[in-house]
Amino acid sequence: MSNLISVAEYTDTLLKHYRIVTVLSERNESKVLRLRHKNLNRDLILRSLNTKVAAYDTLCKVKSENLPEIYDAKVLSDGQIVLEEFISGITVADVMKSGKYRYRGAKHVLSAVCNALSVLHQNGIVHRDVKPENIIISDEGRVVLTDFNISRRISTNTKDTVVMGTVGYASPEQLGVTATDTRTDIYAMGVLLNVMLTGKHPSETLARGKAGKIVKKCTAINPDDRYQSAQKLAEAL
């Protein structure tokens, strides 16, 4: 019998020192809260997950300007709790409500995300959900890739058995055809670039010129035909 406490018990203990500022999201599989320390007036993000995401163990040890700091990731009796840096800012999705990006602005954002992905991939993690809603532009202009709830450790031996990701951004291999790897994130980056420039999925409207060529290579059906690393994509940008 496990001696681990539950997610609810851990949260109750934490809330003796923090108060809930807002519920950022609530789904069947997860809940995300913004908390504020009652005495220190400092904010953090609390993620309650109903399954263990192994990638968070690695993320606790990873540092990058373009990734949020993960303070702790505790496996509990009925799930996992993640304590994460709160970043004040707006998402790329929020920015796009005011209009499309120009190439220079999109390049700045994607180059930063490429840096984040390079760090993840070097540590054996594939993000699997790169999209405008998961990229924050901080009040200071820092570009940060967030939300690792469906990230996985890279394995060449197992294919994805559960369809995960966001429709339109998910690569063919995320449908269970084969194992996801670093090139899965490259596919999503191509869709992201196209959406930022045109407001449309590349299957509807392809970006013009150099950007369109980059998008086509990123979103090739065969992963071998895509950029083989985030660094190679950054160089192409």
Where do the model's predicted regions map?
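Conserved HxN/HPN-centered segment at the entrance to the catalytic loop
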Residues: 63-72
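Conserved activation segment of eukaryotic-like protein kinases, specifically the C-terminal portion
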Residues: 160-173
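Conserved HRD-motif arginine in the catalytic loop of eukaryotic-like protein kinases
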Residues: 226
